[in-house]
Amino acid sequence: MPLLKVAKLLWAAPCSAVGLLFAAVPLSFGGKGAWRHGALEVTYRRNQASCGKLAHALPFRGIVFGHVILAVTDEELFHIGPHERVHVEQYERWGPLFFLAYPLSSLWQILHGRSPYWDNHFEIQARHRSTDVHREGGGV
């Protein structure tokens, strides 16, 4: 493994550790995980029909902590995977500082009357870069 990749894994490792703690929940209830595209992708169920009420009530369909991508279903991961992998790259760049930078970007947006999610710098970048990946024929 190239030294730079090892450095990125180590730099994001504290965030990935948090992701592993959260991943234990779906995995303990029959979810599945696999290392793909440079991250551990964990899903709870194959599709929405097989999810319970709690999974439907979650305020997100996918979330990333370091090199751990958590998605509710395989179907959703297929659609949001490119976007979430941009967040993995952001964790590789920012490391543990991402846990501070992301909410600060959201706070900045709120203070300027904008959406803390849609106008967050990291979300804008993820939407833009994941759209480019799909246009170029990359992605999932």
List PLM regions with ranges:
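Metalloprotease/metallohydrolase-associated module, dominated by Zn2+-dependent proteases
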Residues: 1-60, 98-140
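Short pre-active-site segment immediately N-terminal to the catalytic Zn-binding motif
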Residues: 57-82, 92
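Residue-level detector of flexible, active-site-proximal loop/helix-junction positions
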Residues: 76, 95, 133
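Hydrophobic alpha-helical transmembrane segments and immediately flanking/interface helices
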Residues: 80-84, 90, 116-119
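Catalytic Zn2+-binding segment of zinc metalloproteases
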Residues: 85-101
